[in-house]
Amino acid sequence: MTGSTSSAVAVAMNKLAQREKVLYVTGISGSNDTTGKDCVRYGFRQNFYGETAANAIGPVLLKAYGKNKKMAFMTPDYTYGHTVTKSSSEYLKEHGGWQMVTNQVSPLGATDYSSSLTNIANSGAEVLLNVNWGRDAVLSTQQAKQFGVIPKMKLVIPYQIPFLAKNIGAELSEGVYASTDFWWTLEDKYPLAKMFVEAFRKKYGYNPEWGAENAYMSFAMWADAVEHAGGFYPPDVIKSYEEGRKLQSMVGEVYFRKEDHQLVRPVVIVQGKKPGEMKGKEDFWTVTEIIAGAPLMQKPDAFGCNLGEYT
């Protein structure tokens, strides 16, 4: 099984996979819980998540904006939102003395953020961290501009949303820091990225966002696990994943951690380009750092992972 751009869906799929003993290759899921307290033996995740995003972007924000800042959060009301906000706020508080002055929580699918933005505008915050996902992220960012919150406050996207810059425009993404799984200009650095981006561009007529990279790599890694297992029997495939073989990806060498089935992989930091600096209509971001994954990760049992049985 595969699918999910919502971590709530990913967690539900984890439970279904374990119950039915069917392998689940996670789609997009940024919650700490997916390979934390809600991990299962039958689930594997390729992409980065709240804790690694926070530990990657945190030092960048402290260097760019300094210590002892006041921060506001916009948080979607489900597992992804709460865990990304928790990891980000805790890192910035512990390492930089940043203070969360307001955390505006909104339901999934909200279209009107006026109440949240009024509270944020009156909070005294200097930095706005928008954790909203998908269309919610687009609408809340656009409305933050309309309310004058942006550019009064620095905007940060602690967990980058595919197609966000395309939808809000370079005028809003300019200067914004974000952590991400992948950006297509990495084709200039990694051979596998170059192969994938060129093939994707030829077939679809535009450059891939990280959701496409995530899907491709997830199934390439599944195929590798099946090949080394010598068949499709799920317990054998799982044990093949758990061997921790070093694999090549679009961001360098990676491997799965056997204790929680989380891929140990770099996190990419990007910053939005000025419109005049863009070399094409999709050239929204500059890759500023590629940060090794292992030092960003919590200990395997820190978030309560207990994988369960093979059969």
Task: Show where each model-derived region lies.
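Sec-exported extracytoplasmic/periplasmic mature domains
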Residues: N14-V22, L62-K67, S89-G97, T118-A125, ...
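Extracytoplasmic ligand/sensor domains, especially the bilobed periplasmic-binding protein
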Residues: M1-N103, K152-A178
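Structural motif
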Residues: A53-I57, V105-I120
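Catalytic-loop motifs flanking and including active-site residues across diverse enzymes
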Residues: A53, I57, V84, D136, ...
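Solvent-exposed, acidic/polar segments of extracytosolic/periplasmic ligand-binding ectodomains
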Residues: E174, E243-T311
